[in-house]
């Protein structure tokens, strides 16, 4: 009888240990989440099986949230194939497979309130509840103009480059959406925000003293990213990879000319979240990319960024 009770207590203790370990694993899992930002190029319709390859790539990355650019009607297929919730950044009456709609958001987690703007082609968002905690997510695209493959070779001073940057569509777009970013950025003590996508801009974080020898001795505080930093938003990739020499984070390249740049980003702000890791992935259009040992033909001309976060 004594041995019976001893064995019973041992089993109970082992069961308790198992429950504790299981609870710890579940809490650790739900306390972290992964975000991916990707411009898939024309809805991934420019190569055979392009949408299917987008799905395969996202499955290998396994993000909790995807901030997508150039959706162009492919969203429902991608979301249904992944089993993700899907939010199209457009007016509510817009068909989910509308071929003219640019931005979208995908999530493993439930959606909250929509975040509509007057400029849905280049900014919009939605609340997402991760482990019951609300985060505001924004997908973004800015125009590429003005653009130069090598601004350091334009013969301009720093001041002239900053004025050149303001000369066309991109700067005007940023100014239009700035009130939204200020509004939601001011509320991040209670509701954090994550902003990501294709900004089509160089970063002042990549044009500092460490890289000036690469840039004709120019240190350029590019307006587009500096504006976000001034709002308190953190460039997650550069935070986790502070050396732009060893980790350039290239997401835009061209085989025919010297045009390698980091132009796709995930920014964040909030007291309750912090980034823990960030990676960039890059391949050329219609060429293989290797993820987790699997070869997939790449459907886009942009690389993508993946950042892991945790709740504090």
Give the location of each predicted region.
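Hydrophobic h-region of N-terminal signal peptides that target proteins for export
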Residues: 19-27
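Structural recognition of the beta-strand scaffold that forms the well-ordered cores
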Residues: 34-37, 65-69, 104-105, 136-139, ...
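Metal-dependent phosphoester-hydrolase catalytic domains
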Residues: 117, 183-193, 200-312
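A long, amphipathic alpha-helix that forms part
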Residues: 163-189
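Structured beta-strand-rich core segments of catalytic domains in phosphoester-bond hydrolases
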Residues: 47, 65-151
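N-terminal, active-site-proximal structural segment of metallo-dependent hydrolase catalytic domains
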Residues: 5, 10-12, 26-82, 95, ...
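Stable alpha-helical elements in mature extracytoplasmic
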Residues: 50-54, 71-78, 102, 170-180, ...
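A solvent-exposed, charged loop/short amphipathic helix patch at secondary-structure junctions
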Residues: 148-168
């Amino acid at each position: 009888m004594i041995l019976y009770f001893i064995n019973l207590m041992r089993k109970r203790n082992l069961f308790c240990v198992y429950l504790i370990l299981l609870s710890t694993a579940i809490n650790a899992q739900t306390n972290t989440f992964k975000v991916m930002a990707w411009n898939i190029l024309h809805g991934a319709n420019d190569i055979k099986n392009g949408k299917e390859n987008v799905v395969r790539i996202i499955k290998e990355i396994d993000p909790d949230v995807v901030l997508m650019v150039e959706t162009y009607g492919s969203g429902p297929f991608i979301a249904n194939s992944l089993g993700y919730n899907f939010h199209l950044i457009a007016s509510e009456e817009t068909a989910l497979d509308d071929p003219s709609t640019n931005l979208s958001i995908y999530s493993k987690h439930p959606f909250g309130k929509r975040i509509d703007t007057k400029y849905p082609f280049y900014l919009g968002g939605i609340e997402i509840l991760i482990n019951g905690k609300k985060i505001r997510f924004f997908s973004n695209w800015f125009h590429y103009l003005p653009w130069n493959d090598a601004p350091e070779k334009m013969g301009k001073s720093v001041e002239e480059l900053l004025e050149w940057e303001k000369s066309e569509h991109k700067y005007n777009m940023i100014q239009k959406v700035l009130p939204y970013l200020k509004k939601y950025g001011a509320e991040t003590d209670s509701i954090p925000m994550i902003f990501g996508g294709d900004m089509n801009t160089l970063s002042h974080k990549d044009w500092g003293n460490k890289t000036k020898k690469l840039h004709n001795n120019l240190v350029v505080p590019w307006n587009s990213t500096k504006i976000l930093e001034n709002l308190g938003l953190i460039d997650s990739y550069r935070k986790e990879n502070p050396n732009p020499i060893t980790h350039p984070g290239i997401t835009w390249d061209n085989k025919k000319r010297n045009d390698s740049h980091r132009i796709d980003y995930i920014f964040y702000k909030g007291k309750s979240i912090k980034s823990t890791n960030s990676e960039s992935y890059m391949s050329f259009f219609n060429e293989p990319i290797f993820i987790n040992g699997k070869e997939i033909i790449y459907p886009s001309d942009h690389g993508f960024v993946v950042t892991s976060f945790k709740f504090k």
